[in-house]
């Protein structure tokens, strides 16, 4: 009986479950594609900021808007320095001693309870229950970095976002950074929602239908809620309003798409019946000791009439993606590679060389499953790199990322 109770206690803790990156909020795409992609977009600006603070003997103050369970803390402290070598193990830009304060704000008390349970052991981390639009920035010491990741500001009206960014610009010191992530207007996931009348179609009815049901439990009734979807011109209009209100205190550093063809609703086909479960398949690429059918990773892009520029971006990325996957498959099989595309962008050619090197090394390995644990994860990283280097910041990914700097 004691043994049974001991194992039951372990099961209830949730720590006795088989780990997997194939499903859930923290799946492989979230950790190895999305978190790292956001970090790579932010990295050059973050490195400059940290270098300035270090020269002055100062530490970083971070404010996470809509922090949820505190994921932003792990995200920001895990960004790797661009100058680190393969021999190093302490490679984070923000070393433990560089963080003065991480403060998270969220309106959801349940998520804040979870955040406190996770980070309670850290003395320089705290969480506040509040609507971040109502938070008095003037009552606090200025922050150096403001996070609003994973669609946080898609909960805001444009007027609220302009007011928030205006307050941040006025209250912050020179060099402060802001990273925002809206839902992209022209993500392939919601092809049925594409419109040219952006003034009257700012919102989508979003539903979290992609998380698996708990074993043995009836799936809960799903709740739809409004989220702002954002294209490039709309984001630039918001930026211009903030510049006008602040006298130019805010500079746009980067506007970029993320998670093209791997957003969560690719697997549900909730808003586009033509979607393939590409997120599940890319999760499989990153999963150790799991081999993936690469034929299924090929994108079958279905254009929508009337959206020439959007279709051109998606089709170009799909063609390059498919060529990289097909060539990798030919390398693994030792078969003839496909004919070159009419256009072979430099990023594609460079990534093909990378995969040739990876497969060559894997072919000589006699330990472990070289395909599943070396070739496929590297293919996943190369597909991510392909997206990053071909994207145009048009709102064609699941997220549209904006990075701003305060200039005084």
Where are these regions (language model features)?
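A short acidic, Gly/Pro-enriched loop at the edge of an enzyme's catalytic core
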Residues: 138-146
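Short alpha-helix
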Residues: 224-246
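A short glycine-rich, Lys/Arg-flanked "PGG" loop and its adjoining helix->strand segment in the class I
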Residues: 162-174
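Class I SAM-dependent methyltransferase Rossmann-like catalytic core
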Residues: 5-54
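Class I SAM-dependent methyltransferase SAM/SAH-binding core
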Residues: 70-134
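Conserved class I S-adenosyl-L-methionine
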Residues: 59-68, 178-207
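C-terminal lobe and adjacent flexible extensions of AdoMet/dcAdoMet transferase-like proteins
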Residues: 262-408
């Amino acid at each position: 009986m004691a043994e049974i109770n001991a194992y039951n206690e372990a099961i209830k803790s949730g720590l006795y479950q088989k780990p997997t990156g194939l499903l859930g909020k923290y799946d492989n795409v979230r950790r190895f594609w999305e978190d790292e992609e956001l970090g790579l977009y932010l990295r050059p600006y973050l490195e400059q900021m940290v270098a300035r603070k270090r020269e002055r003997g100062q530490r970083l103050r971070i404010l996470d808007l809509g922090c949820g369970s505190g994921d932003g803390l792990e995200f920001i402290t895990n960004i790797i320095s661009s100058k680190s070598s393969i021999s190093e193990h302490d490679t984070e830009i923000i070393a433990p001693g560089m963080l003065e304060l991480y403060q998270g704000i969220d309106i959801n008390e349940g998520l804040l309870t979870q955040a406190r349970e996770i980070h309670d052991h850290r003395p320089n981390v705290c969480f506040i229950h509040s609507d971040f639009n109502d938070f008095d920035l003037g009552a606090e010491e200025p922050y150096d970095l403001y996070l609003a990741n994973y669609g946080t500001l898609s909960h805001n009206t444009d007027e609220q976002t302009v007011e928030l960014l205006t307050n941040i610009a006025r209250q912050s010191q020179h060099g402060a950074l802001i990273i925002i992530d809206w839902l992209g207007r022209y993500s392939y996931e919601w092809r049925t929602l594409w419109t040219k009348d952006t003034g009257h179609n700012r919102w989508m009815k979003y539903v979290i239908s992609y998380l698996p049901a708990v074993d043995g439990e009836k799936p809960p009734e799903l709740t739809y809620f409004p989220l702002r979807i954002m294209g490039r011109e709309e984001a630039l209009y918001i930026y211009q309003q903030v510049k006008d209100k602040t006298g130019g205190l805010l500079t746009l550093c980067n506007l970029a798409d993320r998670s093209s063809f791997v957003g969560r609703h690719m697997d549900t086909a909730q808003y586009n019946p033509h979607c393939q479960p590409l997120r599940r398949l890319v999760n499989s690429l990153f999963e150790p000791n799991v081999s993936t059918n690469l034929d299924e990773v090929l994108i079958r892009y279905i254009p929508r009439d009337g959206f020439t520029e959007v279709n051109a971006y998606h089709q170009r990325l799909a063609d390059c993606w498919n060529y990289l996957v097909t060539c990798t498959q030919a390398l693994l099989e030792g078969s003839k590679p496909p004919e070159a595309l009419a256009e072979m962008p430099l990023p594609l050619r460079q990534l093909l060389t990378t995969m040739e090197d990876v497969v060559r090394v894997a072919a000589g390995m006699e330990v472990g499953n070289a395909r599943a644990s070396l070739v496929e994860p590297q293919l996943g990283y190369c597909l991510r790199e392909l997206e990053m280097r071909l994207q145009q910041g048009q709102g064609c990914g699941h997220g549209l990322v904006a990075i701003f700097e305060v200039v005084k």
